[in-house]
Amino acid sequence: MFPPSGSTGLIPPSHFQARPLSTLPRMAPTWLSDIPLVQPPGHQDVSERQLDTQRPQVTMWERDVSSDRQEPGRRGRSWGLEGSQALSQQAEVIARQLQELRRLEEEVRLLRETSLQQKMRLEAQAMELEALARAEKAGRAEAEGLRAALAGAEVVRKNLEEGSQRELEEVQRLHQEQLSSLTQAHKEALSSLTSKAEGLEKSLSSLETRRAGEAKELAEAQREAELLRKQLSKTQEDLEAQVTLVENLRKYVGEQVPSEVHSQTWELERQKLLETMQHLQEDRDSLQATAELLQVRVQSLTHILALQEEELTRKVQPSDSLEPEFTRKCQSLLNRWREKVFALMVQLKAQELEHSDSVKQLKGQVASLQEKVTSQSQEQAILQQSLQDKAAEVEVERMGAKGLQLELSRAQEARCRWQQQTASAEEQLRLVVNAVSSSQIWLETTMAKVEGAAAQLPSLNNRLSYAVRKVHTIRGLIAQKLALAQLRQESCPLPPPVTDVSLELQQLREERNRLDAELQLSARLIQQEVGRAREQGEAERQQLSKVAQQLEQELQQTQESLASLGLQLEVARQGQQESTEEAASLRQELTQQQELYGQALQEKVAEVETRLREQLSDTERRLNEARREHAKAVVSLRQIQRRAAQEKERSQELRRLQEEARKEEGQRLARRLQELERDKNLMLATLQQEGLLSRYKQQRLLTVLPSLLDKKKSVVSSPRPPECSASASVAAAVPTRESIKGSLSVLLDDLQGLSEAISKEEAVCQGDNLDRCSSSNPQMSS
């Protein structure tokens, strides 16, 4: 041992003793600050490889620091063992120590600078971690909200699809029912129209047969009139022969009655006989007057004969009695003359009696003929009235045909209205389909957004896991920095949260509510249109039933009128038969009629013929009009049948197109459901692959299980209707969100406790360093 020197310039031995290790934290090298706290997922493997390559450098740096700390102890021990060599090596040691101190001071300064930089970076990293935690919270909350919204949107989409499918089926069913009812009503109307047309054809054929029978009867009446004319000509010849015989007798008697007076009387008689039944009494009076005149003439003739006999007796008186032969001859001549005159008088009286009897008989025949003429005129008036009734019935039938045409036009208008209603219903269906397609497009966009958010979730989870690993690796270096960051966080306001996703979610919810309102409004509009179409169809059906009842009543009336016409025709035929029988009886009586009555009968027959010809021409004209109307009705009926066939073909084509459209829509919806199911399975598979579901089950199993059991019990005790599926899904999504928030809060609490512990350790280390520095400064000064 060397005695200590008295030189005060030497360094005391305590300076060379082993110093306790400083409690300063080991400062990380500068290359640790260059590692970013949060890296994108693409650079995670590269950063991990850099960490693996930089770990040997960290171990080398720690070994250097430990060797630097152990070096003063070895030096102290070398001075105690080799005291003899200490003096010789003091200068070198002092110089070396000074260099070492300078180097250490430089390193301390560099370490302080690096610590400040590390603090700044750690503060930034803490803020970034905080932002990442918030972003993770927001992302998880957004993911849960999007999942809940996706589930709700899926439920709403299913409900909308089911509602639209039900409404489409209901509309199609109503459309089919209306089509069937309208086609049935159309068929019934067509059948009624065809039956009415057949009835009209039958009535027209019966009228034609009646007209043919009447024409035959008219021909028979004309033939009978010809026979009557021939008989009248024969009777006229007989009368002329009788008149010539009477004139010869009158000439033979010697009394000449002027022919003019006779012709005048006959003319007067003819004129009187041609008059009506009111002048028959005057004719009878005139005949009585003529009979009295003839009686006076007979008396005058007898008086004249008596005078002539007296004159002859005076002329043929004998002058003497010697001429008896002459007297006898004259007496015999006078007797013969008297006998002839008596015979002629008897004959004349007989002829006069016969003439008076014939006159009386002819008067009776004239009266009977007049009565028959009046009865025939009455029958003719009745027939004319019946013909007018038939014409009126034909007119009524024509008006009925016009009414049927109007009803047909109304039915066509109703069919056009129904077509317009079907077109409007199809347009509304197209609008509904467009709305459904737009809602599907919106759902696809939301699904794409949800898929994008779900695709971002793994990257966020990777970043969060990397940040957690990095926090664990640099836990011993960020105590003070976390404390400063906490102080700054308390002093500074929080950064505004990211509201883009919340705004987008709010917009999506508003869009969903708006689409729900539009779909409900469209459903109500469709229901109103369907109800209106149903009411219109019911009103049209009632109107068509009323029209059918009216047509049936008109058909019954026409049948009754046809039956009455048939009865009238039978009565007319019976009357015609009676008239033919009376004509046959009259043929026998007309052999004794005179020329006057023949002419009157000819005139009457001519008048009847003209009237009947006019009636026949009128009936033929009406029959032609009826035929034309029938032809028009047949043409219109054929047109209606063609139109009905065309409408039937159109309805079949429309039904086929609707079936094809429904099949295509069903296939498209099935494909869409398969795609959605596949996307859902892919999303669930990605979630299971990333481990989110398993982590969530591990962290929140004990907390969620009682609530789930309580919910299951409540669901079992009070079952809900299927309409509450959307609310149930949203309620089920709430505990998942709360569980994620709980796990994040636990992680943040752990980080805060760790930061507080590190800050306390750094504070203690800084106090020790300050004490050491203050104790070392006086020694250095001494």
From Swiss-Prot:
Keywords attached to this entry: Coiled coil, Cytoplasm, Developmental protein, Differentiation, Nucleus
Name the UniProt record assigns to this protein: Coiled-coil alpha-helical rod protein 1
Record Pfam families: HCR
Region feature Disordered, mapped onto this chain: 62-82, 185-218
Chain's role: May be a regulator of keratinocyte proliferation or differentiation.
Residue ranges the record marks as coiled coil: 82-314, 344-398, 498-691
Subcellular location, record wording: Cytoplasm; Nucleus
